[in-house]
Amino acid sequence: MRTARFSNPPGLCYVLRVPRPNAIQLGDEISIPILYEDRSVLVIDKPAGWMLVPYNWDKTGRNLQLALSSSILGGEFWARSRNLKFLKYVHRLDAETTGALLFSKSPGALKTYSEMFESRRMSKRYLAVVRGNPKRQEWTCDARLGPDPNLHGRHRTDAQGKDAETHFKVLEQKNGLALIEARPVTGRTHQIRLHLAHAGLPIVGDTMYGAPEDRTRKTALMGLRAIGLEYQDPFLRKRVKIEAPSKEFIEQFFLVS
């Protein structure tokens, strides 16, 4: 909350309280909702199409971290009203994945929350819309993952790769599609996408690991959304549970009969 003081006429003082915006404004057209905030972190509802770590210089035009840092440096009101000088992502979401993304407000917080992710003290939940009919209502995939030596930026299941584990639960099935809750234990690159493809359930709109009809559509909406983060906060000394809205995401795939 910002406070402005002014007097008119002399001797009469007014206090104007301007609430901090509940969204990050990047330019005139891009508004990113803020899902949660405390003194150490800020969680946004990441839109599709923004990368956090561009894998080549041709992709830097949609670099979310760069855009946020530039906005803070430029003194935009959403940042100025919070007296923000630092904002850095703690974990990553793929470019086309939407949903809850946690940022730290200081280098110290970045170190603390990064260690929490690395030590698996952060519980994460995703929704995935896949093609096909799951054979089981619940299952766990522990296929190991590694980079694909034949294509930069792509990964694959690899017996010699890093350990990876994801728990899955079917929530709904309709018209050859299934809505699945994914709870990754580890945080490997493209983990949920690869584990579902490995199960014969490619994510709708996944142009890298999806079904043939999705790989040829470069503008398809990808059916993967981060809907929850939960952790014991070391600074607030309480359990924090953050949820991203999911109704609109689900309706984009399941309202069409």
Features from the language model and the residues they span:
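RNA pseudouridine synthases
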Residues: R2-S257
